[in-house]
């Protein structure tokens, strides 16, 4: 079937397989709202510049709003032979308003049109993601307040290292997510330039006002170079990069939840709302939500890698390869949205098992550093010497199969005669975490202050 939008040069329509590989309407239909917003701004500018007569502008504006309403009601028919959302909208507009619709594309190409649509969609999505990340931060900070004093093991190499609190652990993710929000906002600031009016690649001879269309669409300014305007997909790459880093953070937390909910750890419980059962093993409660967040992180990272590979060999300006920017970008950013919603729900649903956490915090000689610090403070011992002495004390306790706090004073003094019974005050896990009062440390009062500061900064949930 001949394509009415560009078929004049061709004696026949495309081969069926060409039509299939060429069409993007199956996925770029989600740009409909942005496409119509861009067209409304464009036609208003054409009218104000005297390029189109007022009656055509009015007809086109009314027709575009009718198309938008049809799409919203689910009545719009998306046809593959029209290739993409731009042609689909223009074709229906022509049916509604007649030949005047053909004037809409004056001083515009699909190259600058799709670049504008994509920037609008990514910008809208980044704004929504920022709000979701803030909600997850809020959930974590609220949990940190409740569990500022709940002792748990801190790990390095997935081995017990030093006691921390559950609240402190939650606040670590609040900080990571704050950086994610910064990256989303940086990406948004850089993408907020409008390519509309760059036309195919060289600009246009019509007296358009690109500053007017940029302002109408909420952009800070028009893009400065017409070639770059249509060739650039940095805005998608940067957004996918920020999304990938955020997904890595979510995946790390999801991995911890998978481990922590296992019978072997038993650190936290998730409700039925975020777990599933087994078709054969009736006892199972599987942390599927966390596992899916972990898996979707790979999908998001894959979208970034895929688009980098698409773009790496493209000469200026536009190539059809760039049509492949959409599916990965759409899927990745919407997958991240789903992951953020799931994680916020799981965090609010989490039930830490305090006794199990405390017991685990005391295992693995996690207060050994506290002993070394005590030797430095009380015996004025150089830290390297204190480290060596503490290692010998740990070895002595390990040989007896007991904890540090269970080793007798005589046993310790056999290694270092200067040790007194005052040392036992620092070997308990509560005393250990309480002593970590340095800025950013795990002391419960620190955690409460930082969590409160975050909640004040984040503000109430937006309705």
From Swiss-Prot:
Keyword Signal annotated: no
InterPro entries xref list: Arg_succ_lyase_C (IPR029419), Argininosuccinate_lyase (IPR009049), Fumarase/histidase_N (IPR024083), Fumarate_lyase_CS (IPR020557), Fumarate_lyase_fam (IPR000362), Fumarate_lyase_N (IPR022761), L-Aspartase-like (IPR008948)
GO MF entries: argininosuccinate lyase activity
Main location as per UniProt: cytoplasm
SUPFAM superfamilies reported in the protein's UniProt record: L-aspartase-like (SSF48557)
Keyword vocabulary terms for this entry: Amino-acid biosynthesis, Arginine biosynthesis, Cytoplasm, Lyase
EC number: 4.3.2.1
Location within or outside the cell: Cytoplasm
CC annotations in GO: cytosol
Gene Ontology terms: biological process: arginine biosynthetic process via ornithine; L-arginine biosynthetic process
NCBIfam families, A to Z: argH
Similarity field: Belongs to the lyase 1 family. Argininosuccinate lyase subfamily.
Protein name in the entry: Argininosuccinate lyase
Name of the gene this protein is made from: argH
């Amino acid at each position: 079937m001949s394509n009415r939008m560009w078929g004049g040069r061709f004696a026949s329509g495309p081969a069926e397989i060409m039509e299939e590989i060429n069409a993007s309407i199956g996925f770029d239909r989600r740009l409909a709202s942005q496409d119509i917003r861009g067209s409304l701004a464009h036609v208003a500018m054409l009218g104000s510049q005297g390029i189109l007569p007022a009656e055509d502008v009015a007809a086109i504006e009314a027709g575009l709003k009718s198309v938008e309403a049809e799409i919203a009601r689910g009545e719009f028919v998306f046809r593959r032979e029209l290739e993409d959302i731009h042609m689909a909208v223009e074709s229906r507009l022509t049916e509604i308003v007649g030949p005047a619709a053909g004037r809409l594309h004056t001083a515009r190409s699909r190259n600058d049109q799709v670049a504008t649509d994509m920037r609008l969609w990514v910008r809208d999505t980044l704004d929504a993601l920022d709000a979701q990340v803030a909600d997850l931060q809020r959930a974590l900070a609220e949990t940190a307040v409740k569990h500022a004093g709940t002792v748990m093991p801190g790990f390095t190499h997935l081995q017990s290292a030093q006691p921390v609190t559950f609240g402190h652990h939650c606040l670590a993710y609040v900080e990571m997510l704050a950086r994610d929000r910064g990256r989303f906002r940086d990406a948004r600031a850089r993408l907020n330039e409008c390519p509309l009016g760059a036309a195919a690649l060289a600009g246009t001879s019509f007296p358009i006002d690109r500053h007017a269309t940029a302002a109408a669409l909420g952009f800070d300014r028009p893009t400065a170079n017409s070639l770059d305007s249509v060739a650039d997909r940095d805005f998608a790459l940067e957004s996918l990069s920020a999304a990938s880093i955020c997904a890595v953070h979510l995946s790390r937390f999801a991995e911890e939840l998978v481990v922590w909910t296992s019978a072997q750890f038993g650190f936290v419980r998730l409700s039925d709302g975020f777990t599933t059962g087994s078709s054969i093993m009736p006892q199972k409660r599987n942390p599927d939500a966390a596992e899916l967040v972990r898996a979707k992180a790979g999908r998001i990272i894959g979208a970034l890698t895929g688009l980098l590979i698409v773009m790496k060999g493209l000469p200026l300006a536009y190539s059809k390869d760039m049509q492949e920017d959409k599916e990965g970008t759409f899927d990745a950013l919407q997958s991240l949205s789903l992951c953020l919603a799931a994680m916020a729900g799981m965090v609010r649903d989490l039930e830490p098992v305090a006794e199990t956490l405390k017991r685990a915090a005391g295992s693995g000689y996690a207060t050994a550093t506290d002993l070394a610090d005590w030797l430095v403070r009380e015996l004025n011992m150089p830290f390297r010497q204190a480290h060596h002495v503490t290692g010998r004390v740990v070895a002595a306790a390990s040989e007896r199969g007991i904890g540090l706090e269970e080793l007798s004073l005589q046993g310790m003094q056999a290694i270092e005669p200067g040790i007194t019974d005052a040392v036992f005050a620092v070997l308990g896990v509560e005393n250990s975490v309480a002593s970590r009062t340095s800025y950013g440390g795990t002391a419960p009062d620190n955690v409460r202050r930082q969590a409160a500061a975050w909640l004040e900064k984040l503000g109430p949930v937006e309705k």
